[in-house]
């Protein structure tokens, strides 16, 4: 017999055996059909300049015992935008109203685009979030206090947060680097995109504003993994 164009043979000496084999064939056909469904790609998000603050930094900048105020949830579970804003000061310029993201981190980190870093005269090496060794320095200020950050300024390496299920689906593993293709008027292929796999993640591509501008980013844009 043929099912959706595939020629299959149902084997078995008894009716029950034939029914079991047929059920297996139907399951396999369903799996194949799912694999052949058009992949809509992975949602792309653009991340602007922001800071992650340690508990010590929060208390220095806002006061003893101060707790960050959640404004809205972000795409990754447990991550959120705060009501608080800070000023970033470099040798060549100042950036006001910079977002603070919660919750508190073990170490303070400032994420800028390369354009931002150039504008205020700071070094922002391309690194994964959390890797602040040999990174740039900057001053973080509020109306209450000033923090001189000796290290912690980075340009975040473009990456994909991905669930284990989606990692298996796309045949990628944690810490692997892939290429992604973004379609559109300014379609582009980004290389060296890091894979970060965790059950705690939602599957999303994260670009900074320089990268987002390069591909003509619009809300709802999607990217496909190219190997």
Each predicted region: which residue ranges?
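Short beta-strand-centered segments at strand-helix junctions
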Residues: 50-91, 96-143, 148-175, 179-181, ...
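Acidic, glycine-rich active-site loops and adjacent beta-strand->loop/helix elements
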Residues: 184
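Short coil-to-beta-strand transition motifs
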Residues: 187-189
